[in-house]
Amino acid sequence: MGETFSQLASQKDENKLILPPNPAFGSKAASYSSMGNSRPFFSCVPCERAAGAGFVTCPTCQGSGEIPRELEKQLVALIPYGDQRLKPRHTKLSVFLAVSICLVTSSLIIFFLFPRTIAVQPVGLNSSTVATDEANVYLNITSILNISNNNYCPITVTQLTIEVLHLSLVVGQVSHSLLLHIGPLASEQMFYAVTNRINDENTYKICTWLEIKVHHVLLYIQGTLTYSYLSRSEQLVFQSYEYVDCRGNTSVPHLLVSHPP
């Protein structure tokens, strides 16, 4: 029984330490507990009314009230739901700017990395040499290709395959492994040579008889250009027709395309 009274006495002493019997504190606590009302910032007692008392500035009253100094480390600061400090500032502007930056960045990436066409244009015959034996006509031709890169990224030409036909028969073919780099929005010229052997009696007469004034043969050239672009390999097919003088050697100068630095 004595132990029970002693425990009750100690609890009363602790309550006295935590909540001192101060009429000013009673009004303060009542005011502090009413912060959930519609006007939370004006519920605390103003600072000038507590002059000389053991109070500190209330952390949730924007400096307009005080709490007991003894409970400064025990009370938890409560911020009302409608407090301006809980409202993020410039949220709409920040979200708008973030979305705009993402859209602009995505649009620029799509614009610059979107694959565009690679133009391959046969310029024509640059030179040819002719040789004959008893039944065959040998034509060594050199032609020019214009390659235009319309992309904003560089490309690399890796292979060129050429096939030459005369009267629907394959008379020459060649395949080259290349490593030709073409910059963004740039053009390059490349030369390729093909050795052709024509085994046709009428063509042989056209090329060797002196009585015939026109010594031209028609060659059909078809080719495949392989290039890589952004780690992706693609092929382009081109074709052209060339009239070749099979009586003598010819050389046709072509104006080279100027390349940007």
UniProtKB/Swiss-Prot annotation:
GO terms for biological process: glycoprotein biosynthetic process; innate immune response; macrophage activation; positive regulation of canonical NF-kappaB signal transduction; positive regulation of interleukin-1 beta production; positive regulation of interleukin-6 production; positive regulation of MAPK cascade; positive regulation of MHC class II biosynthetic process. Keywords: Cell membrane, Immunity, Innate immunity, Membrane, Transmembrane, Transmembrane helix. It comes from the Eukaryota. The chain crosses the membrane at residues 95-115. Pfam families: TMEM106, TMEM106_N. It is a single-pass membrane protein. GO terms for cellular component: plasma membrane. It is found in: Cell membrane. The keyword Disulfide bond does not apply. Activates macrophages and polarizes them into M1-like macrophages through the activation of the MAPK and NF-kappaB signaling pathway. Upon activation, up-regulates the expression of CD80, CD86, CD69 and MHC II on macrophages, and induces the release of pro-inflammatory cytokines such as TNF, IL1B, IL6, CCL2 and nitric oxide. May play a role in inhibition of proliferation and migration. Belongs to the TMEM106 family. PANTHER family: TRANSMEMBRANE PROTEIN 106A, TRANSMEMBRANE PROTEIN 106B. This is Transmembrane protein 106A. It comes from Bos taurus (Bovine). The lineage of its organism: Eukaryota, Metazoa, Chordata, Craniata, Vertebrata.
